[in-house]
């Protein structure tokens, strides 16, 4: 097993443990998944029906992990994903962020890639200035790529962010194998 595959497997196991915590009884697992799906559905509906903000998304950077690619490939790839998006978002009673979004940007091959989904982040305000915030969470959505004939591709990815007031720099990491995936993708999210 290569280092890249071990890293991917470690990340996958970590996020599966967060998303689907193990219970003492195997019989409780289906109820846990059902409860998680119900909460997810409720959060999506509440964000859609009762948003607090309208968001502008501006893609900022894609970076292909150099340890996971041949140099010839990374030399050809686009890492400036210009595009734009919009969304609706809210902060819940715990101070966590929920958002629905749609975005289109130029992918690694400089072709348009749309993405739409729901994102959630646990949010912390570690400084005395409450305008500064950091977050960790996930996004569930669907994308489509030119090199896959624009077939819809479901996704579950980690999210992280750092922000001040209405401006947030949000990011994800797309895991993969050698010469595929292993991409850091980040964007600016402005709340109005």
Curated annotation (Swiss-Prot):
It is an enzyme of class 2 (transferase). The gene is pagP. It is found in: Cell outer membrane. The record marks 178 as: Role in the phospholipid gating. The active site is at residues 64, 107-108. Transfers a fatty acid residue from the sn-1 position of a phospholipid to the N-linked hydroxyfatty acid chain on the proximal unit of lipid A or its precursors. This is Lipid A acyltransferase PagP. One of its GO terms (biological process) is lipid A biosynthetic process. InterPro entries: LipidA_acyl_PagP, OMP/PagP_b-brl. Keywords: Acyltransferase, Cell outer membrane, Membrane, Signal, Transferase. HAMAP family: PagP_transferase. Belongs to the lipid A palmitoyltransferase family. It comes from Cronobacter sakazakii (strain ATCC BAA-894) (Enterobacter sakazakii). Homodimer. Coiled coil: none annotated. One of its GO terms (cellular component) is cell outer membrane. Residues 1-26 form the signal peptide. It catalyses: a lipid A + a 1,2-diacyl-sn-glycero-3-phosphocholine = a hepta-acyl lipid A + a 2-acyl-sn-glycero-3-phosphocholine; a lipid IVA + a 1,2-diacyl-sn-glycero-3-phosphocholine = a lipid IVB + a 2-acyl-sn-glycero-3-phosphocholine; a lipid IIA + a 1,2-diacyl-sn-glycero-3-phosphocholine = a lipid IIB + a 2-acyl-sn-glycero-3-phosphocholine. The record marks 73 as: Role in lipopolysaccharide recognition. GO terms for molecular function: acyltransferase activity. Gene3D superfamilies: 2.40.160.20.
